[in-house]
Design a protein with these regions (language model features):
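Histidine-acidic metal/acid-base catalytic patches
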Residues: 1-6, 13-31, 63-65, 92-97, ...
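Active-site beta-loop-alpha junctions enriched in small/polar residues
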Residues: 8-12, 35-39, 74-77, 105-108, ...
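Active-site acidic/histidine proton-transfer and metal-coordination neighborhood
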Residues: 19, 61-68, 76-161, 170, ...
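Hydrophobic residues within beta-strands of alpha/beta enzymes
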Residues: 32-33, 70, 101-103, 131, ...
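Glycine-rich, proline-tolerant flexible connector loops at the mouths of alpha/beta enzymes
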Residues: 33-57
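Short coil/turn segments at secondary-structure junctions
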Residues: 42, 104, 134, 207-210, ...
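Alpha-helix N-cap and loop-to-helix initiation/capping positions
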Residues: 46-54, 81-88, 108-115, 139-142, ...
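Catalytic-core regions built around general acid/base machinery
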Residues: 50-64, 115-123, 177, 225-229
Length: 272
């Protein structure tokens, strides 16, 4: 099986899903992700669960392009997490034929987070969807070790960890930490690049992650070392937002370069 490369929604968040499917297909990608709920209050999201016309158009574009929907973003688990408002989100993810739902954590209580994550997994299981916990250095679940504890404690067959190359580096994670993560936890991973040293402030860290990432191979991250420790056939989500470069090049060219760079960097990387 050939490794698949999909465009993450953050790479071209302004494009509604039908247009992103078409642009990603022209760029040589295998699929896309869809952000149906925002990463932060007021952020961009394409709420297909509330827009039947946009959902129909997205499904039509998916069929016309032959592309897949890799993942749906995002569920945020806070101290007062309530699963019920997400039911329509989950149903729409299944209707799109997605494989994974991205989860982030804002609750400092790990036991409570693990219990909530288990409920998310249980709700997704009938749809054949996995729940994948993405650690981010500015959230309550800031690194690989914390995500591993939560996913292990939840003990759900469809629970996993999403490794983002930038977050892995900025959280100070070490490559050897991946050796103890069960391969079954690692359903897919996100690729990008950036300077070896990250911004000094929290605000700078968040801005770089959300608005200004580099194409794979043009920064200082050890991408070959990282992906050599991830499952060889795990799909790749290309997450390369750039508020400065993408508008100059145009979406088609930016996505084309992102796909080509990702394939080039991972060519010959065996994985495990």
């Amino acid at each position: 099986m050939t490794r698949q490369f999909c465009i993450g929604p953050l790479t071209a968040l302004a494009l509604p899903p039908p247009r992103l499917l078409e642009a990603a297909a022209r760029a040589g990608a295998d699929g896309i992700g869809v952000r149906m709920l925002p990463a932060a209050p007021g952020g961009i999201a394409h709420r297909l669960m509330d827009d039947a016309a946009l959902l129909r158009e997205t499904l039509a574009a998916k069929a016309a392009t032959g592309m897949r929907i890799l993942d749906i973003e995002m569920v945020r688990i806070g101290p007062a997490f309530d699963l019920e408002p997400y039911r329509g989100f989950f149903e729409t993810a299944a209707a799109l034929g997605a494989a994974h739902v991205l989860v982030a954590g804002d609750d400092p209580d790990e036991a409570r987070t693990a219990a909530a994550f288990a409920r998310v997994c249980e709700a997704l299981r009938p749809y054949g969807l996995s729940a994948d916990f993405e650690f981010m250095p500015w959230t309550a679940v800031r690194d690989l070790a914390a995500a591993k504890r939560i996913v292990a404690a939840a003990a759900q067959v469809n629970g996993g960890i999403l490794v983002d190359a930038l977050h892995f580096a900025r959280a100070g994670c070490q490559l050897h930490e991946l050796d103890d993560v069960p391969p079954g936890f690692l359903h897919y991973a996100q690729i990008c690049d950036g300077p070896l040293r990250g911004p000094a402030t929290l605000e700078g860290l968040i801005h770089a992650a959300r608005c200004e990432r580099g194409l794979p191979g043009e920064g200082g991250l050890d991408l070959k070392g990282l992906f050599d420790r991830l499952p060889a056939q795990a799909p790749i989500c290309i997450e390369t937002p750039s508020d400065t470069r993408a508008p100059v090049l145009g979406w088609d060219e930016w996505l084309r370069q992102a796909v080509a760079a990702s394939r080039r960097v991972l060519r010959g990387v065996a994985g495990r």
